A protein has these predicted regions:
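N-terminal helical capping/dimerization or prosegment-like subdomains
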Residues: 2-85, 89-96
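Active-site metal-coordination/substrate-binding segment of hydrolases
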Residues: 80-150
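A structural signal for short hydrophobic beta-strand segments in well-ordered beta-sheet cores
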Residues: 62, 106, 239-242
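Hydrophobic residues embedded in beta-strands of well-ordered beta-sheets
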Residues: 70, 112-113, 249
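Fold-independent oxyanion-binding glycine-rich loops
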Residues: 67-68, 88-90, 110, 152-153, ...
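Midchain, well-structured core segments that form catalytic/ion-binding scaffolds
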Residues: 162-260
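Acidic/histidine-rich catalytic neighborhood of metal-dependent amide-processing enzymes
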Residues: 121-197
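Short beta-strand segments enriched in hydrophobic/aromatic residues
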Residues: 76, 90, 152, 255-257
Length: 260
C-alpha cells in the first residue's frame, strides 16, 4: 500500500475511533476509594473494563492484571517474552469547572474533540489502538508482539505501572502517547545521563563536572555536543545531581532540546 492508501484507511476508521472514545469519555475514571476488585476506585476499574472490551471487539488478545492495569496484544508471545510496548492510561483528573460542553460527553465542534480525557489520555491511547487495528487487518506483522498497555493510576502515582513491572518484563522498545501526542512528543527531547566512577577516581569525576557541566554556559560546548537550530533554539544542560550508589560515585544531568 502507498501513503495515500494508508491515509484513506486511517480516515475510514475514524468513525469507529470516535465511537470508542465516546464510550471511554463517558466514564468518570477519577481515582476513588479502594474497593474489592477496584484498587483505584470504581471509575478507573470501569474504564479498564471498557477499554479491554473495545480491544477485544477489535480482535486483540487482552489481559487484565489484578484490575490495576491491562493490555491489548497483537501477535503471539515469544519464548523470550520480548514485546513492543505502547503505554498510556485511562484514568483522568477531576472534571473541574467552566466546561462549555458536557465533560463526560464527547463533543465534536469546529473540527475538534471535547471531553475529559480526549487529550490526556483516552484519545491518544485509543488512536494507537485503532491504528494498530488497521495494521492488523492489513496483515502487517512484526518480529515480536505489540502491546498497548492501559494504566489506571497515572494521574495519582503510577501505581498501575509499578504493579505491571512486578508481573511482566519491560518492553524491548516503546513509547508513551500521552497528552498532545504526537506533536509535543515529537518536539521535545530529553536525555538523562549518568556518569559513574569507582571511589579511587572520584577526584576526576568532580573535575569533569566542574569543567564540563557546572562552570559553563550549560549548552554543551565543553562536551562538544552544542546544538541549535532556528526552529527549536539551543540545547541546554541542566539538573546536575551527585550521589553514590553501589559504591560508585556519579554525576547525572539532563540534556534538553528544545529547552522549554
Amino acid at each position: 500500500m502507498n501513503q495515500e492508501e494508508w491515509i484513506a484507511e486511517l480516515k475510514g476508521i475514524q468513525p469507529a475511533l470516535f465511537e470508542g472514545l465516546r464510550r471511554m469519555v463517558a466514564i468518570p475514571s477519577i481515582r476513588g476509594e479502594a474497593e474489592d476488585g477496584a484498587p483505584f476506585g470504581k471509575g478507573p476499574r470501569q474504564a479498564l473494563d471498557e477499554v479491554l472490551a473495545i480491544a477485544s471487539e477489535l480482535g486483540f488478545q487482552t489481559k487484565n492484571i489484578d484490575n490495576k492495569i491491562g493490555y491489548a496484544q497483537y501477535g503471539e508471545d515469544r519464548p523470550d517474552g520480548a514485546y513492543y510496548g505502547i503505554f498510556g492510561h485511562v484514568d483522568v483528573m477531576p472534571l473541574g469547572e467552566g466546561w462549555i460542553s458536557p465533560a463526560l460527553d464527547l463533543t465534536v465542534r469546529d473540527g475538534r474533540l471535547y471531553g475529559r480525557g480526549t487529550l490526556d489520555n483516552k484519545g491518544p491511547i485509543l488512536s494507537n489502538l485503532y491504528a494498530l487495528y488497521v495494521l492488523k487487518e492489513k496483515g502487517v506483522t512484526f518480529d515480536r508482539p505489540v502491546r498497548i498497555v492501559f494504566g489506571t493510576n497515572e494521574e495519582t502515582g503510577f501505581g498501575c505501572v509499578k504493579h505491571y513491572l512486578t508481573k511482566e518484563i519491560p518492553p524491548t522498545f516503546g513509547w508513551t502517547p500521552d497528552c498532545k501526542w504526537p506533536v509535543v512528543y515529537g518536539e521535545r527531547g530529553r536525555l538523562r545521563v549518568r556518569l559513574s566512577v569507582s571511589s579511587d577516581k572520584v577526584s576526576g569525576l568532580y573535575t569533569f563536572a566542574n569543567e564540563k557541566l557546572l562552570h559553563t554556559n550549560h549548552r554543551g560546548e565543553e562536551l562538544g555536543i552544542a546544538y541549535e537550530d532556528s526552529d527549536f533554539g539551543m540545547m541546554q544542560l541542566r539538573g546536575e545531581t551527585f550521589g553514590v550508589e553501589d559504591g560508585r560515585h556519579y554525576v547525572e544531568w539532563t540534556m534538553c532540546y528544545p529547552a522549554s
